[in-house]
Amino acid sequence: MTNTLQMTRRTMLTGAAVAGALTPILTSGGGNASPTPVRKLSATEIAALPRRKLDLVKPPFVHVHTQKAEGGPKVVEVTLTIEEKKLVIDGKGTEVNAMTFDGSVPGPLIVVHQDDYVEVTLVNPETNTLQHNIDFHSATGALGGGALTVVNPGESAVLRFKATKAGVFVYHCAPPGMVPWHVTSGMNGAIMVLPREGLTDGHGKELVYDKVYYLGEQDFYIPRDEKGEFKKYDSPGEAYEDTVAVMRTLTPTHIVFNGAVGALTGENALTAAVGERVLIVHSQANRDTRPHLIGGHGEYVWRTGKFVNVPDRDQETWFIPGPTRGAAYYTFEQPGIYAYVNHNLIEAFELGAAAHFKVTGDWNDDLMTTVRSPSGS
């Protein structure tokens, strides 16, 4: 196993060097291809912009932010610390040697506004064992920043990119030769780039949300022993070969929301009140998904998460292709428990892709009422 891990690291380093060599090609070709020219600020102008530091929070919650931009573009400072850690992902004690941004699966949701400059400090503590980087699907050039942020244990890097596109986007680790292993070990998150004037229905109506929740759907691939029991390992490197063998079957053993079966159900349910307008950001970095709110609807849905597009209306289920982030807006109208699921019901009920909303308020008989209670014939 040690030799395999060493070979893997050499492959990663070689790949990183190749990616670095490609960087001038990628960046030099990007400007002319841009369909929407954006004024280029000089280094001096960027240095003079106001700066704002984000205090990120763990999902399903989202840091404090304004829905409309205040003033002009800013430099938004973000720090993401990589943490390799064991996570228990179900009630049976099944473990995964997770790779995470800031210790959670998914990594924190970052919220900025279009045309802000996002300055990310990526920290790989010396307590980790592997090389990592970060690829922002919202960024332009250098493999989403992946070619510029390769950090070994004990290193850090600082990347700045301009958030030119409005929408919800994936970010994930993408070390050369090992991308799927890192992503399916939990190393992904999302960034939401809001339009500077806030969300609309595409026809001029403002869409203001009272709450925003961030759900990360994660597929895990846990090896089994000869008795069919899930195996446990001391480190990610020790688990590597067995995990990749399961990954190649394209058959997850677990598909969960926010890192574990039941992480967002029961006592951990998301909360809302009748009349509250809730934005649900749905994150899946690897597979297609089909969110459905049982008892409710997608009042406005950006299926691929891009706010320049007119949202779909009154959806029962919406399709989010992987790897894409989607967003849905809903005003809760009845109290009770709502199940939010991947409506591939096998994945929801058998593998774990389910969450609950617990909604308080007064019941509306006009929307639903019992005409006759269940009784014998």
Swiss-Prot record:
Domain notes: The type I copper site in NIR plays a crucial role for electron transfer from pseudoazurin to the type II copper site of NIR, which comprises the catalytic center of NIR for the reduction of nitrite.
Pfam family, one: Cu-oxidase_3
BP GO annotations: denitrification pathway; nitrate assimilation
Cellular component aspect of the GO annotation: periplasmic space
Top-level taxonomic group: Bacteria
Domain Plastocyanin-like per the UniProt entry, residue ranges: 99-194, 259-360
Main location: periplasm
Textual note on the cofactor: Binds 1 Cu(2+) ion. The Cu(2+) ion is held by residues from each of 2 monomers of the trimer. Nitrite is bound to the Cu(2+) ion site. Pseudoazurin is the physiological electron donor for the Cu-NIR in vitro. Binds 1 Cu(+) ion. The Cu(+) ion is bound within a single monomer.
Residues given in the record as Cu cation 2 binding sites: 137, 172, 343
Entry's localization field: Periplasm
Gene3D superfamilies given in the database record: Cupredoxins - blue copper proteins
Record-linked PROSITE patterns: TAT
Family listed: Belongs to the multicopper oxidase family.
Species annotation: Rhizobium sullae
Stored NCBIfam families: Cu_nitrite_red (TIGR02376)
N-terminal signal peptide: 1-35
Keyword list, A-Z: Copper, FAD, Flavoprotein, Metal-binding, Nitrate assimilation, Oxidoreductase, Periplasm, Repeat, Signal
Gene behind the chain: nirK
Protein's recorded name: Copper-containing nitrite reductase
E.C. no: 1.7.2.1
